[in-house]
A protein has these predicted regions:
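Short acidic alpha-helix initiation/capping motifs at coil-to-helix transition points
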Residues: 1-5, 46-47
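Short helix-to-turn junction characteristic of helix-turn-helix DNA-binding domains
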Residues: 28-32, 71
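A cross-family signal for key residues in well-ordered alpha-helices
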Residues: 26, 39, 69
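Recognition helix of helix-turn-helix DNA-binding domains
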Residues: 31-66
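Basic, Lys/Arg-enriched C-terminal extension of HTH/homeodomain DNA-binding domains
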Residues: 5-11, 53-80
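The N-cap/first-turn positions of alpha helices
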Residues: 20-24
Length: 80
């Protein structure tokens, strides 16, 4: 799923996501797994997991699929 810059800005503001959390979320939405995300961002696998845990907690979801569904739902409600 590819989102526009203003959509990412909106999502970031909704849940107070850090710039690194947004980077991780963008790669999740592109379908990358944790190992690929770590390689792309040059961070450890466990660091990716920590960022995802923080994102899931802030957004109130469990898992990548639910994260993407919540992003879509929020953007549809906001008509962005």
């Amino acid at each position: 799923m590819v989102l526009k810059s203003k959509q990412w800005d909106y999502l970031s503001k909704c849940w107070h996501l850090t710039p690194r959390e947004i980077q991780v979320a963008k790669l999740v939405c592109k379908g990358l797994d944790n190992e690929q995300i770590g390689q792309k961002l040059q961070i450890e696998y466990n660091t990716v997991r920590a960022h995802l845990g923080n994102i899931f907690h802030k957004v109130g979801v469990r898992g990548k699929a639910n994260l993407i569904l919540e992003f879509v739902a929020v953007l549809q409600r906001a008509k962005i």
